[in-house]
Amino acid sequence: MYTLTTSGKTISIFSCAGSECPIIYLNTFSNEGQKVFEAAQAASCPPFTLVAISDLDWNHDMVPWDSPPAFKNTDPCTGGADDYLRILTEEIIPTAEKKITGVPCWRGIAGYSLAGLFALYSIYQTDLFSRVVRVAIQNFLKNPVISMVFGHPNRKISCISPHFRATVLKQPPFFTPKTKCAN
């Protein structure tokens, strides 16, 4: 693992041994990168590089618009996703990818809760990511992102990884990958 800081964010890089592995950017609330990477390895996931970003202002960095608090006695969401996306694309990604071996065969973004919302939002704002994982998007937000995901002509679902199908969905393939890594 390699750790660095940029723009007040802590970036932890868990590198793949290969030179053309996919790279996944995971925004975390409590610095869970190590646990996620270890769980993926324990589940025999194909090799990948994980870049976990922590020290986020969760209710600001992950949300595209202002919104009232989700729960009692919590802060409102203040719509800073565009600013954070600029930091991610102009600072974090170039810095992280200088630290790995080779060139990633594809780049993905993942997140849970509000970071899941950010992951979905980001694929409509930049073409840097060809894969997205969203876990438990916040239902309290009234947002246009949900309809955009299912209605946007350039962002139709093209595949679900065979490993995800087999271990999580317990279902046969419904989508076929358009691109594969060499490994």
Tell where the protein language model's regions lie, with residue ranges.
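Alpha/beta-hydrolase fold nucleophile elbow
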Residues: 100-112
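Short glycine-enriched nucleophile-adjacent loop
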Residues: 116-126
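Active-site loop->helix "elbow" adjoining a glycine-rich segment at hydrolase catalytic centers
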Residues: 84, 113-116
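A domain-start/cap signature at the N-terminus of enzymes
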Residues: 1-22, 48
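Alpha/beta-hydrolase-fold catalytic nucleophile elbow
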Residues: 54, 110-112, 135-136, 163
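Residue in the alpha/beta-hydrolase core beta-strand immediately N-terminal to the catalytic nucleophile
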Residues: 107-108, 131-133
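The feature captures the conserved acid-bearing segment of alpha/beta-hydrolase catalytic domains
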Residues: 136-183
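Serine-hydrolase catalytic machinery in alpha/beta-hydrolase-like enzymes
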Residues: 20-99
